[in-house]
Amino acid sequence: MAQAAKKQNLGMGRRKTSSARVFLRSGTGQIIINGLPLDEYFGRETARMVVRQPLVKLDVQSRFDVYATVQGGGDSGQAGAIRHGITRALIQYDEEGGEGGTWRSTLRKAGFVTRDPRMVERKKVGLHGARRGTQFSKR
């Protein structure tokens, strides 16, 4: 007989060019990203802090295990995408009868629910970058 699948919530998160699929299960607070623990995957403490923010805000770090697969972008974008995914998974858990539907407003006030729309501006023809032009020479 097949074992019943463990209840989990899925949250998709995006930031810059990164995209993350986050699976939230009840557990002990373990965070696994692309098969590696959080501390091994992100070298910078800032990125680790960003990933933990929604769990810390709701004070539920030790109640859930987080499994995430993330691709594209750099460290900052990936951390932001995972944070967005965790937030969406927490809201899904909450609205399915977890805590009575109060987490969404708390997370929205903290600014975690909204997808950050800022993207890298494209490089223009005739310029060195998006806006940087050639150096001006008076003579």
Curated annotation (Swiss-Prot):
GO cellular component: cytosolic small ribosomal subunit
Entry keyword set: Ribonucleoprotein, Ribosomal protein
PROSITE patterns, A to Z: RIBOSOMAL_S9
GO terms of molecular function: RNA binding; structural constituent of ribosome
UniProt-listed Gene3D superfamilies: 3.30.230.10
Pfam family, one: Ribosomal_S9
UniProt keyword annotation of Cell wall biogenesis/degradation present: no
InterPro entries in the cross-refs: Ribosomal_Su5_D2-typ_SF, Ribosomal_uS9, Ribosomal_uS9_bac/plastid, Ribosomal_uS9_CS, Ribsml_uS5_D2-typ_fold_subgr
This protein's name: Small ribosomal subunit protein uS9
Family affiliation: Belongs to the universal ribosomal protein uS9 family.
GO biological process: translation
The species this protein was found in: Coxiella burnetii (strain CbuK_Q154) (Coxiella burnetii (strain Q154))
